[in-house]
Amino acid sequence: MLVLKTFSLFILTALAEILGCYLPYLWLKKDGSVWLLLPAAISLAVFAWLLSLHPTAAGRVYAAYGGVYIFVALGWLWLVDGIRPSTWDFVGVGVALAGMAIIMFAPR
C-alpha cells in the first residue's frame, strides 16, 4: 500500500510541476494568454506543497521523484504533444524507475 501511495503521490507531483511549466511555455512560445500564468503559479504552488507530503527525507524524495518525473514527462509527450516515445525512451524510463525504487524502498 505504501508503494502505491508513494508512486501516486509522485505522479500527482510531476503533473503539477509539468503543468506549472507548460502553461508559461504556451504563453511565451505559442501566443497564449498572459492569464495562463495564474494557473501556472497555482500549479507550481501545489507542486511544492505535494513535495512536502512525501514520507521521507527531502533529498531522497527529490532524487527518487526524478524517475517518476521522467515517466510522467514522456506520458505528457505522448498524450499532450502527440509524439510517441521511442523504444529507447521506454528503456530509459524503466532504468529511471528502477533507480527510483532502489532509492525509495531500500532497507535503511
Swiss-Prot record:
Keywords: Cell inner membrane, Cell membrane, Membrane, Transmembrane, Transmembrane helix. The keyword Transmembrane helix applies. One of its GO terms (cellular component) is plasma membrane. It is a multi-pass membrane protein. Its main location: membrane. It holds the Pfam family UPF0060. Coiled coil: none annotated. It is found in: Cell inner membrane. The chain crosses the membrane at residues 7-27, 33-53, 63-83, 87-107. Belongs to the UPF0060 family. HAMAP family: UPF0060. This is UPF0060 membrane protein Mfla_0485. It comes from Methylobacillus flagellatus (strain ATCC 51484 / DSM 6875 / VKM B-1610 / KT).
